A protein has these predicted regions:
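Basic, polar low-complexity surface loops/patches
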Residues: 1-201
């Protein structure tokens, strides 16, 4: 037996976002399948059902209404998860064959914009740290307000001072960066490939 075209598309999209829970738009719902469905159903106390997927066993499945998705995203992000949102990129009524879908948004502690998830008394900073040529480049942004700061420091102590000053919700860094000491701040940390950082020769 072979996977259905829709489930093949789902798994290909999931493969491109392995560190995220995938919310896959199907009509008026975002659906989750397989392991993601098990995790989301448990974390959000949703009913876990199943869907025919072309295999002998049904794929575990759960879903949330698209119009209420922000509340569910807030709850998952507060538990430390990242969520990739795959939207329908064409009208299903006009699509020839399988509806095209693409990930249009990845929601993390530093990129969430839902008002219910943000505090009016505190910025929600996302901090990028790149370590090159024995220096730390630091960029800090609150995408909900547009506040943006950049600086460069030479010493780890100075870097930790910056992390303490901004208290970011999330830090992204290049692989050359050692995260020693940063974990003490209780912040979500992600290491991204060098290609995501503009390295000046």
């Amino acid at each position: 037996m072979a996977l259905s075209p829709m489930m093949t598309q789902y798994l290909e999209t999931k493969k491109e976002n392995p560190d995220c829970l995938l919310f896959y738009r199907l009509g008026d719902f975002y659906e989750m399948f397989f392991e993601d469905a098990k995790i989301v159903s448990q974390e959000l106390e949703l009913t876990l059902t199943g869907k025919d997927c072309g295999l002998e066993e049904r794929a575990p499945m759960c879903g949330v209404p698209y119009h209420a998705v922000e509340g569910y995203l807030t709850r998952l992000v507060s538990k430390g998860y990242k969520v990739a949102i795959a939207e329908q990129m064409e009208d299903p009524k006009l699509a020839k064959g399988l509806v095209k879908r693409e990930v249009v948004r990845i929601v993390t502690p530093g990129t969430i914009t839902s008002e219910s998830a943000l505090s009016i008394d505190k910025n929600n900073y996302l901090m990028g740290i790149v370590y090159l040529f024995d220096r730390f480049g630091i960029a800090t942004v609150d995408i909900s307000t547009g506040d943006f700061y950049v600086t460069e420091v030479n010493e780890t102590r100075e870097l930790l001072d910056e992390v303490h000053r901004f208290a970011p919700a999330e830090i992204i860094c290049n692989p050359s960066f050692s995260m020693s000491g940063i974990g003490d701040f209780g912040v979500t940390i992600s290491s991204l490939d060098h290609q995501y950082f503009n390295e000046v020769e």
